[in-house]
Amino acid sequence: MDLSETALAEAVGAARQAFARAGDLDALARLKTEHLGDRAPLALARQALGGVPKDQRADAGKRVNAARAQAQQAYDERLAELRAERDAAVLVAERIDVTLPSTRQPVGARHPITILAEHIADTFIAMGWELAEGPEVEAEQFNFDALNFPADHPARSEQDTFYIAPEGSRQLLRTHTSPVQVRTLLARELPVYVISIGRTFRTDELDATHTPVFHQVEGLAVDRGLSMAHLRGTLDAFARAEFGPQARTRIRPHFFPFTEPSAEVDVWFVGKKGGAGWVEWGGCGMVHPNVLRAAGIDPDVYSGFAFGMGLERTLQFRNGIPDMRDMVEGDMRFSLPFGVGA
């Protein structure tokens, strides 16, 4: 192997010319192997140093190392140039013309159940009521026992209620928001005027008029001297807020374990799609004395009323929605008409 300065200079010159001709990074990588790899002339020159006489080996080594450094520098410079060209091309390709009209992003919509729940809350807060909350995983004591449900009441069966494992834990997914009544009476000073809005769970099949997970609004008032007249006035105000100023209510005798007397509420209103008439809306009544006693309240001193309505049902008949499944499928096309980005 010729280790003269002339031979090494020729090898360096060949490498420089080759690197300069490289049109892209892939081509440069191939040329690097050819001129700086283990079988390249400069690599073979380094291997040949072993055959050089000892008194000449140091000078020869310096020449070989200098030549290789020059070739490496030529490679590094061309590599930097090609990378700069690539980055510039990417910037041009991805350049954004800020003068062009922007691409409009789709606007989301809040779910109509959320909108209805917040409107109901605002209505009662304006009347001086407060909001109350309770857990969705509830104790059987609050869901049934404290609400005067007898031990053999059919609502306690697994055909109607989701119980939490293990068996015998007496924990369940609340079947109504009425447990908030008891928790509120135990936790707050009287008088009490609260509403609770939240999810409830029953073993219903999802169809056009039923869903296993639905929302309820529960109203509770306990004070001295409350009567059915106060309940009727509250229901009428609630109905007008949700169904329009012409709406009115009527009540029909019914039975609920936690109220006495109990009634079902019908509402008359003009529908959003035309037509007017009476529709069953929910349940109501005077708080049962046993419920007051369970909360440590003397029913001879205090009385109260309660009412409860389903939000999905309210939305369905108020807005003429034929299929309740539309409310749970998450299709934004269903939610948009109720309030874009509301």
Curated annotation (Swiss-Prot):
PANTHER family assigned to the protein according to its UniProt record, in alphabetical order: PHENYLALANINE--TRNA LIGASE, MITOCHONDRIAL, PHENYLALANYL-TRNA SYNTHETASE
EC class (word): ligase
InterPro entries per UniProt: aa-tRNA-synth_II, aa-tRNA-synth_II/BPL/LPL, Phe-tRNA-synth_IIc_asu, Phe-tRNA_ligase_II_N, Phe_tRNA_ligase_alpha1_bac, Phenylalanyl-tRNA_Synthase, tRNA-bd_arm
Recorded catalytic activity of this chain's protein: tRNA(Phe) + L-phenylalanine + ATP = L-phenylalanyl-tRNA(Phe) + AMP + diphosphate + H(+)
Residues binding Mg(2+), per UniProt: 260
Cellular component terms per the entry's GO annotation: cytoplasm
Protein family according to the UniProt entry: Belongs to the class-II aminoacyl-tRNA synthetase family. Phe-tRNA synthetase alpha subunit type 1 subfamily.
GO molecular function: ATP binding; magnesium ion binding; phenylalanine-tRNA ligase activity; tRNA binding
Cofactor-binding details, from the entry: Binds 2 magnesium ions per tetramer.
Compartments in which it is found: Cytoplasm
Organism in which the protein naturally occurs: Mycobacterium avium (strain 104)
Entry keyword set: Aminoacyl-tRNA synthetase, ATP-binding, Cytoplasm, Ligase, Magnesium, Metal-binding, Nucleotide-binding, Protein biosynthesis
Subunit structure: Tetramer of two alpha and two beta subunits.
Superkingdom classification of source: Bacteria
Keyword Magnesium: yes
Any single biological process term in GO: phenylalanyl-tRNA aminoacylation
Main localisation: cytoplasm
Protein name (record): Phenylalanine--tRNA ligase alpha subunit
Enzyme Commission number: 6.1.1.20
Cofactor: Mg(2+)
